[in-house]
């Protein structure tokens, strides 16, 4: 069974934590991933080679691997270079996710995707923010497309995710699996994404984002207290 068939119609849980969080320890990320898989997740999405390696030892479902890297001269940060992809693959990722937006990057997108295919033997998930960028990524060889970066780039920051219209456009115009990722905040929303044609649904913050969730609750309660 190929990777796309394994995940079709299922929930992919993004198990990540801020670098300064106690949850960012590899063994804790691995425990999150294992808990998600035990409850039915068909795959997990993991950041950094250290976390991928720990998760690989804990679960046998597909791992979408990435490495967020801050490069001073470039806005792209999700697996921006081939060297990053090499480390992600070596750690045990089954598919490599990367930023496929039109923003400036250290290496040409098509070259990066081709090298991942040819030298690492791994499929590529293109994280995009628009139909145009998705189409360009597929033309460059991307195997899957995710709506991951909608709402997080300069051209889309004015609109919070998810974008149901973008998802519908991607499903209509592209022939590769489309993963709905970003802004999915309830089971109802996840089901809606599948109903619109998403191949699978990725959920992170609403399931594993303890740090952000606590901050949101605290801010809401503080605002209410300040008004009283």
Curated annotation (Swiss-Prot):
| Pathway(s) served | Amino-sugar metabolism; N-acetylneuraminate degradation; D-fructose 6-phosphate from N-acetylneuraminate: step 3/5
GO BP? carbohydrate metabolic process; N-acetylmannosamine catabolic process; N-acetylneuraminate catabolic process
Q: What is its EC number?
A: 5.1.3.9
Q: Which InterPro entries match?
A: Aldolase_TIM, NanE, RibuloseP-bd_barrel
Q: Does the keyword Magnesium apply?
A: no
Q: What is the lineage of its organism?
A: Bacteria, Bacillati, Cyanobacteriota, Cyanophyceae, Acaryochloridales
**Family of this protein:** Belongs to the NanE family.
Annotated GO MF terms = N-acylglucosamine-6-phosphate 2-epimerase activity
Q: Which CDD domains match?
A: NanE
Question: What is catalysed by this protein?
Answer: an N-acyl-D-glucosamine 6-phosphate = an N-acyl-D-mannosamine 6-phosphate
Gene3D superfamilies of this UniProt entry? Answer: Aldolase class I (3.20.20.70)
Question: GO CC: one term?
Answer: cytosol
Task: Write down the PANTHER family for this protein, in alphabetical order.
Answer: N-ACETYLMANNOSAMINE-6-PHOSPHATE 2-EPIMERASE-RELATED
What job does this protein perform? Answer: Converts N-acetylmannosamine-6-phosphate (ManNAc-6-P) to N-acetylglucosamine-6-phosphate (GlcNAc-6-P).
Keywords from UniProt, A to Z, are:
Carbohydrate metabolism, Isomerase
One Pfam family this sequence matches: NanE
Q: What is this protein called?
A: Putative N-acetylmannosamine-6-phosphate 2-epimerase
